[in-house]
């Protein structure tokens, strides 16, 4: 039976996986979400010897079950190749107190590569399956990493165009240069005078603008998304949690069947939601620990049941988590409410009109899987230094947040279940922050910090950063948040 994906806001809006990938966001504003848990035969005594590609095929064939075996082989083979600097794709590294699942070995040295390497192939395959020959325009808001990874994936892919919005003062220098130097005739990067939530809100609005949709269709063009609201982004992230567990079994760190905890640095909630789905298909998970920075709206939600975005937006050293409207939480809310679209829509409408909602009648078994905490800027820096002092291993600030939250969780609960931290970016993406945390000194410049980091860590400078300082800046457009649609229409000539 084909797995059904339904909008979180309309029980009558049901589609297949390929239809969900092609649409990106449901026309009613909801997110396409699997109505049931697919059956996956997870035999870790066998999977421990499987390649990343083999695990991907097992997981994706269950979630994307309207794709043929040949179609999935094509997507997986083209996605997980020598774009990654290790054959393991996502290696697990043992540190003194926890394990790091390194998700930054792709072409843009951030975890977004794990899904955005395959999304272009899933999307173009979905278009063929649905008989769609419109130009597909990827419209995306980024808090730093998604934009570059999406452009790297879609650059010069026939039949596609990609437009990325990012907050002008809300990303690191390295992140900004990675985006503004991106090549590819079909890539467009636009800075906005505003924050990530401003960008994401208007991208969602454009997706739901019926007049704009009709205007685009008249030009044989349609939107899709590279954000984690697209299931084509979300489902591939489930793979690496399955793979991580298999690697722990293979290394003898755990026995097959032992529970593990996953600690995930969290902004838009997609990465930790993928860990939840991994648990649902059979990965033995004890706790899912949701780690936030000082934008701790999720910590408060799990503590109180109230989601309240009415608070100051803080710019931190972990910019990919500087988010107050956590889009993918909507999918968890939908599950917590027994897949009730009407109730979910009511809460999401309240978030828009009142700036908050309170969850009532939630599935306690699901809620109890989660723990949540946040780390301040000082706590994050101190944790990066502690991890370095104990392991001679340098974490990026997002991983540092997760590590600090995990340490606090252990202090509070005395839960010493083996724990994997999703290490979401290379420290080379945030070199000044990493060097400052470890040495107490500011390198004064991102590229000086890259050299300092190389000297301190002995880790080779990744190709994604090497040469970036002198690369040509190709994208220089800055617009007001209110003018995002005008910019899109201008680029697309509609």
Q: Where in this protein do the model-derived segments appear?
A:
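PLP-dependent amino-acid enzyme catalytic core
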Residues: 1-494
